[in-house]
Each structure stands twice: as structure tokens, then as C-alpha cells.
Amino acid sequence: MTITIALPSKGRMKDDASAIFERAGMKIVAVGNDRSYRGRVEGWDDVEVAFLSASEISREVGSGAVDFGVTGEDLVREGIADVDARVEFAARLGFGHADVVVAVPEVWYDVDTMADLGDVAADFRARHGRRLAIATKYWRLTQQFFSGSHGIQLYRIVESLGATEGAPASGSADIIVDITSTGSTLKANHLKILSDGVILRSEACLVRARKPAHDGYPMIDRIISSVRSVL
């Protein structure tokens, strides 16, 4: 059986992932030229590499089209329903750190927690006859956090197709759920993160598709243990 590992196709994520695999004794070599979207692992005949975008990796692992992938935990948890039943987070790789957070306008001086925001959501319905509007690309994580974890139901999600942090200033939403590494972009847009508003502390992960064919197959454990040994 050939095992397929999906890796980021460009940028810092590609470089960092490749470096970890090389330290693990799994040097990634492009098939063809450097712009090729296929690769192999030097000395591992039954392993092939597919270079994909971070969001494609999440989707392909979730569907079982590839066996392993390296991508952000945020994309995996947002993109795959029933995520823990369908994939294994085999290793946290220590790069690509960013937080998915709830951020509100700085001028909301009396709103510092999710409980405060729940009060605001109820007040919006009473005062304005509409639900609190949340701009985000993370609708699944937002629903789980607001409705599941905090019991807030009076809101609506506005799909963000551009720069999410600009939505409150433009009037297209009241607050946002977005990903941030330093918080500087949020501050530049006069937004603040709620004190208990971190939904997910994400980083790059080695993720495995849970497939019956993997059970008892030594190559699966060999790949995971090789990567874990250098972290």
C-alpha cells in the first residue's frame, strides 16, 4: 500500500514542514522540477508526497483521499464535521502558531467576557430588533463556541470573504471571530480580544485520516514515531 502525505505547497509552512521531515529521516524530494506538485520521500519507496494548499490538505485528509497531512489545526477543526472521529492529530509540530479569537470594538468598554457578550446579544434583539452580527470565516468553530460552550443563541454569522477585521468599521458586522498571531492587526482596527474569547490555540499539526486500511500497517506507526522523535 502506498501512503500519501500532503504537505503545504509554498511559503514558510512548506519550509518548516520539510525541515521537520528531514530531521526525522524523511527527506522530501520533488518529482520533476521545484515547481512540481508531487514529491517522494528519499529512501521510503511506499510513501509519496502531494503539495497542496493548507485548506486543500484539510479537505483531502478529511475525505481520506490522502493518508497524512500537515496543516493548521484551525483549518482541520473548521473544515471537518465530527473531526475527532475522522482524523487523528498525530503530532503538534511547533510552528504556525495562531489563535482563533472573539474580538469586539474597543469602545465596548463594559464588554470583556463571553458572559458580557451574551448580555449584549440579548440587548441587541430587544433594542434593534436584530441579532448580533458576527463576521467570520470560521462558522463551525463560532457556532460550537457561542452556542455549545457559552449558550449564546441570539446571533447571526456573516460570511467574511475579505479582511474580517474591517467588518465592524464598515458596518457589515458588529464583532468578529478571526485568527491572529500577534493581535496587532486587531489593535490597528480598534478591536480587543475578550478575556475568555480564545476559541482555539492553533498550530501546524501532522494529521492522519482514520482509515481501516491503516490498522496494523507498520508504515503508519513508523511515520508517526519518526516525526514525533524530532519534536
UniProtKB/Swiss-Prot annotation:
- SUPFAM superfamilies assigned to the protein according to its UniProt record, in alphabetical order: Periplasmic binding protein-like II
Q: What class of enzyme is it?
A: transferase
Name where it mostly resides: cytoplasm
Q: In which pathway is this protein known to take part? A: Amino-acid biosynthesis; L-histidine biosynthesis; L-histidine from 5-phospho-alpha-D-ribose 1-diphosphate: step 1/9
Domain of life per record: Bacteria
* Molecular function GO labels: ATP binding; ATP phosphoribosyltransferase activity
Q: Name one GO cellular component term.
A: cytoplasm
Enzyme Commission (EC) number: 2.4.2.17
Keyword ATP-binding tagged:
yes
Annotated InterPro entries: ATP_PRibTrfase_cat, ATP_PRibTrfase_CS, ATP_PRibTrfase_HisG
Q: Which UniProt keywords apply?
A: Amino-acid biosynthesis, ATP-binding, Cytoplasm, Glycosyltransferase, Histidine biosynthesis, Nucleotide-binding, Transferase
One annotated GO biological process: L-histidine biosynthetic process
Give one Pfam family, short name only.
Answer: HisG
| Compartments where located | Cytoplasm
Catalysed conversion reaction: 1-(5-phospho-beta-D-ribosyl)-ATP + diphosphate = 5-phospho-alpha-D-ribose 1-diphosphate + ATP
Q: Which family does it belong to?
A: Belongs to the ATP phosphoribosyltransferase family. Short subfamily.
Q: What does this protein do?
A: Catalyzes the condensation of ATP and 5-phosphoribose 1-diphosphate to form N'-(5'-phosphoribosyl)-ATP (PR-ATP). Has a crucial role in the pathway because the rate of histidine biosynthesis seems to be controlled primarily by regulation of HisG enzymatic activity.
Share what the entry says about its subunit structure, partners included.
Heteromultimer composed of HisG and HisZ subunits.
Q: What is known of its domains?
A: Lacks the C-terminal regulatory region which is replaced by HisZ.
Name of the protein described by the UniProt record: ATP phosphoribosyltransferase
Organism from which the protein derives: Sinorhizobium fredii (strain NBRC 101917 / NGR234)
